[in-house]
Amino acid sequence: MRQELAQYFSVDPTQITLYWKGRVALYAILKALDIKAGDEIILPAFTCVVVVNPILYLGAKPVFVDIDPKTHNMDIEKIGSKITPNTRVILAQNTFGLSPDLDEILKIADQYNLTVIEDCTHGFGGSYKGIPNGMIADVSFFSTQWNKPFSTVIGGFAVSKNSDLARKLTEYEAELIRPGLKDELTIKTLFFARKRISSKLYWPAIELYRWLSKNNLILGSSQGDELQKPAMPASFFKGISRSQIAIGTREVEKVTEYIDHRKSIAMEFDRLLLDLQIEPPFQPDYAEHTFLKYPLLVKNREEFFNLAHKDKIELGDWFLSPIHPVISDYDRFNYPYGENPIAEKISQHIINLPTNFHVNDEQLSEIIQFIMRNRDGIYHSYNEMVKSC
């Protein structure tokens, strides 16, 4: 898998390190950068709490920047006001598969002597000005969780263009906890199960899976403790398993096919929304969007989900809050609720249409019919949402 990824990114295999989860890759990168207590990391206020946690594990401070409502990426014009003498890193996230304007972020970083980390957990397969996501800044990290275009059930990896960072990450990789037999069996079981879940079974399957993982009864994207407090689990710093490597080695070959499928589905959704006079997601000229998720703003999210549940339509809920999926007691994770109004408002109204490889022609037709039936529950634009709230 390391060799295949190196070939995909046109880098040396020594520049790639493999992990149990993407968040472990981020932790290793921050550690390699010698991030410590008191250091500040700038990141978008529209992310997952498991991205925030590694910052807190090292005693550093996450500093949140509001988002651009068109791209759902960090608003570059608001970064400067967040920089202090303690700022060390800007975390540049590819939200839903869309790269931010990295040239502008790198200009800011150069001005203040900061490191830019590309958060490509959504962005595998996309590009910025023709360059693959993850290959612009000195270092990047990726997630290979089950809902990503390149998946090893769970997992992650880092790509470092900086030789010193690559060496440190390789040293840390040798220190990672080795997955046990239970981990190997769990990966194989989840891979088998996911391949067989149809859209009709999506809601009961996802509800059961989330409940089991929240209560630490099954391996999930996030365990219960990670969502309750920023205390690093004992087995957090874990390496990739043999089962993940075997799956990943096969799946790399299919990445282009998977991403082309997502783009094709997104184009159908674009056509639908334009026909309904609803603004489709913004696609800037500088980036190739891979549409990990297809975002849509709705008037009443709970009601919309209930309708989808009833009609057996798959929908996603990224992001329920600026630090998804946490929806209360934000100060536990150092998030200052009320300071990022755009992200906070969007996170109350956003849903995602699926673009994954399970969406065949029949399911696509069902989703389109569902959207047409419920068009009155969808905002035509971000500005309409703001005016009505």
Language model: regions and residue ranges:
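Phosphate-binding glycine-rich loop
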Residues: R2-E40, V49-L58, F64-D66, I131
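Short beta-strand->loop structural element characteristic of the AMP-binding/adenylate-forming
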Residues: K61-T71, G316
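Conserved glycine-rich beta-strand-loop-beta hairpin in the small C-terminal domain of fold type I
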Residues: P230, F236-V252, K263-D270, P280-P295
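Alpha-helical membrane-targeting segments
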Residues: P179-T249, E253
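Active-site phosphate-binding strand-loop segment of PLP-dependent enzymes
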Residues: K70-E171, N352
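Conserved PLP-dependent catalytic core of the aminotransferase class-I/II
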Residues: E175-L181, S222-Q223, T256-P281, E303-K310
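Conserved PLP cofactor-binding pocket of PLP-dependent enzymes
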Residues: P179-L185, E268, P281-D285, R301-N340, ...
